[in-house]
Amino acid sequence: MNTQFNNKKTSQISWLAIDQEEKIKAKVLSLNRSDRIVELLFKIKAGYRSGPHRHTCETSVYVINGEIFNHSIKETFGQGDYCFQASNDTHDEEFTKNSLIYVNYKSKNDLFVEFLDEESNVLDTLTLQHFEEMMVAQSKEGSPKPPPPGV
């Protein structure tokens, strides 16, 4: 089997803060290295704004609860909404309510997200290795914080 699942029930996986302010927390549910597919839950506090970033992979998002405003397309997504972001979709999202979202990333390479400045220069990235490190951290007691950037 190519897919690795977290060795704990989802309810027992600790939320892992992935930004300095702890506005974004994640649980890696599964990771398939060969197909480069990652499934996660994100818990994001109201007021968080992603800034411009580009998904270099296909991304499916389902809003379990909360609300997201996509500044790039001027669209709000709320509880029960599904959103598909094609590979190389660049956008800027703001979480207007505390939100819980399910995300499925499917990439053609090890790069998933590029974080951009206002001139679209790449400032940081989110890679398969970051997700692997997150899964390892969440599989252990205490869940130490790994070094991935925000989402």
Show the residue positions of the predicted features:
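A short, N-terminal "cap"/entry segment at the start of jelly-roll beta-barrel domains
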Residues: 1-36, 122-151
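Conserved short histidine dyad/triad with adjacent acidic residue
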Residues: 23, 28-30, 35-54, 86-88
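Short acidic-glycine-tyrosine-enriched beta hairpin
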Residues: 33, 69-95
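Short glycine/proline-enriched turns and hinge-like loops at secondary-structure junctions
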Residues: 36-37, 54-56, 75, 95-97
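Residue-level recognition of well-ordered beta-strand positions that form the cores
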Residues: 41-43, 67, 104
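Glycine- and acidic-residue-biased ligand/ion/polar-headgroup-sensing regions
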Residues: 46, 55-71
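Short intrinsically disordered coil segments
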Residues: 57, 116-123
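Ligand-binding loop in jelly-roll beta-barrel domains
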Residues: 87-115
